[in-house]
Amino acid sequence: MTDLTHPLERLVQRAEILMARIEAVLPQPMSAPDWNASIAFRYRKRSNGRGGLEPVRHVATLGLNDLQEIEGQKEKIQRNTEQFVNGLPANNVLLTGARGTGKSSLIKACLNEYAPRGLRLIEVDKDDLTDLPDIIDMVSEQPEKFMIFCDDLSFEDGEPGYKALKSILDGTVAASTPNVLICATSNRRHLLPEYMSENLTYKHTEDGE
């Protein structure tokens, strides 16, 4: 009788090697960082194409009282952030205006103001917005509140990041989670000027908020 033990073992070994190679190239679940390492994190793509959150070691110690001559915008953003950290309905935020008008500083000052109450910030580059569903899925069960921050945002026709962001806000890709707020800044009043009617649904005021 022919002994098939050794050929079968070799076949199993080859199958295991093949599966290991396949798993190496398949997308892996995003691993959570040490949430106690910082109040702010950056999303970064690694050389293998996988993304992850890196803690920001030195967060600017900017406070709301340090920001002058933008009292109207500051009051609205602070009120919206207050509602967010209290678990009440809050609006996603788009701050528009020329460079140097304090848009990013206002977001960072709110972070410092409300970090003791569990507010955290995750900065995501425009090119990585297609990974938003994975980021939201990772933080959805965390007790903290997360502002997902996109700085200096604008799109050209056909960019995948625009559709990804719009899908998140419309709830067509990932269900809205109560501990996630999208905050963005832009030099443009409309993120996609060519199709103003399809722009993201934000509430604008005359002061650019």
Outline where the language-model segments fall.
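AAA+/P-loop NTPase substrate/partner-engagement loops
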Residues: E113-F146, D152-G158
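Walker A/P-loop nucleotide-binding motif
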Residues: G87-A109
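N-terminal pre-Walker A segment at the start of P-loop NTPase domains
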Residues: V59-E82
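Alpha-helical scaffold elements adjacent to nucleotide-binding pockets in ATP/GTP-utilizing enzyme cores
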Residues: L106-C110, D131, I135, G161-I168
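Phosphate-binding P-loop
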Residues: V56-H58, E82-A90
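Short loop/turn elements that form and flank the Walker-type P-loop nucleotide-binding site
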Residues: L88-A90, R117-G118, E141-E144, S176-N179
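Conserved catalytic/switch belt of AAA+ P-loop NTPases
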Residues: S140-E141, D157-G208
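Interdomain "pre-motor" coupling segment immediately N-terminal to P-loop NTPase/helicase cores
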Residues: T2-P55
